Amino acid sequence: WHWVMDDNIEAFERYNNNMKVKCLTGSPFYAMEDFVLRYKNIAQAGPNYSIFCPATDGRPQYKLNTRIYSCLLINNKIPYRWRGRYNEDTDLSLRAMKDGWCTVQFNAFLQSKRATQTLKGGNTEEFYAKDGTYNKSKMLVEMHPDVAFLSDKWNRVHHHVNYEPFK
């Protein structure tokens, strides 16, 4: 197992009883690692985005077979490697699930990060400055036309993935 993380994650939080508490130690990582080590069929795991777990809504501790974005705990035994230029994390999740592997998205642990294109560096200048998010979204749709399509989200072109076939 190994971790891969985006460079624009600002904080990690514990989400319990609709309360978010900032984590100042590595405890969330140890807990997620401990969880996945109990199973042989997990390809990836990681924390959900804090923005998707408002304190007003209850959430289960984890969700199976959905996206793992930006902060990934990856099983070294899966036969897949990064491919493409954009959305490599989503592509990796989809390929694994299509082959029967599971993903675990933790709601008990959350990541707070800046939105795409709001922080200089990373892929902002190289990929997004000219064409926005269109090419990145289009590439994922072309790789997974059976479950992905283009949509408008957050005032920009984005991809939308139907994860229902993996439930």
Stretches found by the model and what they are:
Residues 3, 9-95:
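Conserved catalytic core of nucleotide-sugar-dependent glycosyltransferases
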Residues 2-5, 43-48, 103-106, 149-151:
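A structural signal for short, well-ordered beta-strand segments and their strand-loop junctions
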Residues 84-86, 90-167:
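C-terminal catalytic/acceptor-binding lobe
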